[in-house]
Amino acid sequence: MRTARFTLDPAFTVGAVNPRLFGSFVEHLGRCVYTGVFEPGHPTADAEGLRQDVLELVRELGVTAVRYPGGNFVSGYKWEDSVGPVEDRPRRLDLAWRSTETNRFGLSEYIAFLKKIGPQAEPMMAVNLGTRGVAEALELQEYANHPSGTALSDLRAEHGDKDPFGIRLWCLGNEMDGPWQTGHKTAEEYGRVAAETARAMRQIDPDVELVACGSSGQSMETFAEWEATVLKETYDLVDHISLHAYYEPHDGDVDSFLASAVDMESFIENVVATCDHVGARLKSKKKINLSFDEWNVWYMTKTQAEVSALDWPEAPRLLEDNYSVMDAVVFGSLLIALLRHADRVTVACLAQLVNVIAPIMTEPGGPAWRQTTFFPFSQASKYGRGEVLDVRVDSPTYDTAKYGEADLLHATAVVRARRSVTVFAVNRSRTGALPLEVALSGLELTEVVEHSALADADPDARNTLAEPERVVPHPVDGTSLRDGRLTAALEPLSWNSIRCADPAPGQPPRRPGEGTGFTGTPPAAPPSSSSAPRPDPTARRSPDRTARARVLAAARVRRMPFGRTKVCGAPVRPPTYAPRFQPFRKTWTRWAPAPRSGSPSRRSPTEASIPGGTSSRNVVRYQVTPWRRSPPGSAPGTPAPTRRRRTRAGASRGAPRTARRC
């Protein structure tokens, strides 16, 4: 199989990863809460009824923001039912999932659960804008966040929570575009109530972060029009707009299922374009970020039959999908899609956390175990913090019925302080290993710390109660890093995490911009004897490539795969860098316009610049001669030979210098 390739350079980044990208979701649905995170009679339960075995797995998973209480559940949610003494809390019908809600796990228990996860866990609270409105949202905000001295804040203290909950991130309803939603609204109706709620909540706390409801999927008939209408009302009042997407194979189309991230990336880019279009129309400098607060692999087609058969039970077994290796590979590819858009996707919530389409499964009174999807998420959360590098893959492709031609390789990379890089990669091929070659430019990394893969000879292999460790990541041999080239072989249908690092982590990282010129004493010239050992190629490189990257970027140089660059349309090889530098040389060349039929074959520079008449192509070329190494054996400071200036055939070499325009 042809080798897949891409280049990594810290000068070309997407953006910093927001820790909220590794959020999750706890909804009062099925066994997510009851016998999931909360089971008072369990052998590992603490005094609050929280399962300690589940808490340990949640910490290992690396979850940050946790969205609560829904989901469809929130459109019938009365927050007052979930506070106060447990014995006084009412039982309610949950219309969304045809279940009975006991309210034994409520707002206080949710905050306690987050505190026990650790300081990285952040509340993300949804308010009911389906059957309720502005007043109820304000009362919930006052109860949760106001310090003291009001009826609702004092009521919270009476309930045992003297300190405010400090909820900063709020969702203004859930999936209000969906006809299945209790209290479904049109975009105009929802936009007005969301704007009123946001404006009022900011009167209590101007620093709250608010998420407006976007479309429930890219396939919705109102997609894009919904976002545009809602943002027209709320653009200056909210910080994020939500996206929801779930994927499953349809009619046995596995190839399209494996390329599901193609749809997710398209979804993200279309919503970004819509948001920016609205901002431009409103002449606003503000950018709306994206909250992808529901995403997963979900075999949704069987859900309707499960729900319609229920007769209002408590915590029924619903949506308990058991994930295979293939599901985990698609899941990992969705994670890669989120990381590749980290500049605009600043919040993401895996739906859900326990039992319900979840990476963690439990048995009432029994153990908890990890699903196959647990491992890509935990590795991405652990090693995917930092700056996402811009990855443009050159990969073999395959055909899909749904998305057309798709790459076999889906990849991204995250750099931390230029001391380590983690490559996350998925091989979508079901039949063959995929050779991978990565060029590391501007990254002084020399060793592979770990190459871990999630794959199996049986793509349908799963972890179950009987075999909880049937599928686990395994180390991969043969991955190497030499002379700035990372090479690996990605197993068929696999999720891969490859970590590379600097062998000298004790040294402080270089500050951005440091080393923009050579100020030290130049080393002695290399020996002229042909028998002398050749110096290490890495020793001839610049001690810092930040200056190189900045100057090339300033000259509008586009980097191409594997160390090639393009300067205004002219592909050139990057120069070899040495401690002995020559200054940059700038030359300008005017290209004469192509002669028209019947016109003279040569024209003067003056004629070439006359607008109209002949061809209007008056192209000015800006050519950069970078630092060049002095000739071997020469004294320091000896100028390097000047290259001949390239001009297009027929161009005038005597053209006057002029400024470049692009």
UniProtKB/Swiss-Prot annotation:
<feature type="active site" description="Proton donor/acceptor">
    <location>
        <position position="175"/>
    </location>
</feature>
<comment type="function">
    <text>Involved in the degradation of arabinan and is a key enzyme in the complete degradation of the plant cell wall. Catalyzes the cleavage of terminal alpha-(1-&gt;5)-arabinofuranosyl bonds in different hemicellulosic homopolysaccharides (arabino-oligoxylosides, branched and debranched arabinans). It acts rapidly on the short-chain arabino-oligoxylosides from digestion of xylan with xylanases. It hydrolyzes slowly arabinan and arabinoxylan from wheat and rye flour.</text>
</comment>
<feature type="binding site">
    <location>
        <position position="246"/>
    </location>
    <ligand>
        <name>alpha-L-arabinofuranose</name>
    </ligand>
</feature>
<feature type="compositionally biased region" description="Low complexity">
    <location>
        <begin position="590"/>
        <end position="603"/>
    </location>
</feature>
<feature type="region of interest" description="Disordered">
    <location>
        <begin position="454"/>
        <end position="483"/>
    </location>
</feature>
<dbReference type="Pfam" id="PF06964">
    <property type="entry name" value="Alpha-L-AF_C"/>
</dbReference>
<dbReference type="InterPro" id="IPR017853">
    <property type="entry name" value="Glycoside_hydrolase_SF"/>
</dbReference>
<feature type="compositionally biased region" description="Low complexity">
    <location>
        <begin position="519"/>
        <end position="533"/>
    </location>
</feature>
<feature type="compositionally biased region" description="Low complexity">
    <location>
        <begin position="649"/>
        <end position="662"/>
    </location>
</feature>
<feature type="binding site">
    <location>
        <position position="174"/>
    </location>
    <ligand>
        <name>alpha-L-arabinofuranose</name>
    </ligand>
</feature>
<feature type="binding site" description="covalent">
    <location>
        <position position="294"/>
    </location>
    <ligand>
        <name>alpha-L-arabinofuranose</name>
    </ligand>
</feature>
<feature type="region of interest" description="Disordered">
    <location>
        <begin position="497"/>
        <end position="548"/>
    </location>
</feature>
<feature type="region of interest" description="Disordered">
    <location>
        <begin position="588"/>
        <end position="662"/>
    </location>
</feature>
<keyword id="KW-0963">Cytoplasm</keyword>
<feature type="site" description="Important for substrate recognition">
    <location>
        <position position="298"/>
    </location>
</feature>
<dbReference type="GO" id="GO:0005737">
    <property type="term" value="C:cytoplasm"/>
</dbReference>
<feature type="binding site">
    <location>
        <position position="27"/>
    </location>
    <ligand>
        <name>alpha-L-arabinofuranose</name>
    </ligand>
</feature>
<dbReference type="InterPro" id="IPR010720">
    <property type="entry name" value="Alpha-L-AF_C"/>
</dbReference>
<comment type="pathway">
    <text>Glycan metabolism; L-arabinan degradation.</text>
</comment>
<comment type="similarity">
    <text>Belongs to the glycosyl hydrolase 51 family.</text>
</comment>
<feature type="compositionally biased region" description="Low complexity">
    <location>
        <begin position="628"/>
        <end position="641"/>
    </location>
</feature>
<dbReference type="InterPro" id="IPR013780">
    <property type="entry name" value="Glyco_hydro_b"/>
</dbReference>
<keyword id="KW-0119">Carbohydrate metabolism</keyword>
<feature type="binding site">
    <location>
        <position position="352"/>
    </location>
    <ligand>
        <name>alpha-L-arabinofuranose</name>
    </ligand>
</feature>
<protein>
    <recommendedName>
        <fullName>Intracellular exo-alpha-(1-&gt;5)-L-arabinofuranosidase</fullName>
        <ecNumber>3.2.1.55</ecNumber>
    </recommendedName>
</protein>
<feature type="binding site">
    <location>
        <position position="72"/>
    </location>
    <ligand>
        <name>alpha-L-arabinofuranose</name>
    </ligand>
</feature>
<dbReference type="GO" id="GO:0046373">
    <property type="term" value="P:L-arabinose metabolic process"/>
</dbReference>
<feature type="active site" description="Nucleophile">
    <location>
        <position position="294"/>
    </location>
</feature>
<comment type="subunit">
    <text>Homohexamer; trimer of dimers.</text>
</comment>
<keyword id="KW-0326">Glycosidase</keyword>
<feature type="site" description="Important for substrate recognition">
    <location>
        <position position="352"/>
    </location>
</feature>
<dbReference type="GO" id="GO:0031222">
    <property type="term" value="P:arabinan catabolic process"/>
</dbReference>
<dbReference type="GO" id="GO:0046556">
    <property type="term" value="F:alpha-L-arabinofuranosidase activity"/>
</dbReference>
<feature type="compositionally biased region" description="Basic and acidic residues">
    <location>
        <begin position="537"/>
        <end position="547"/>
    </location>
</feature>
<keyword id="KW-0378">Hydrolase</keyword>
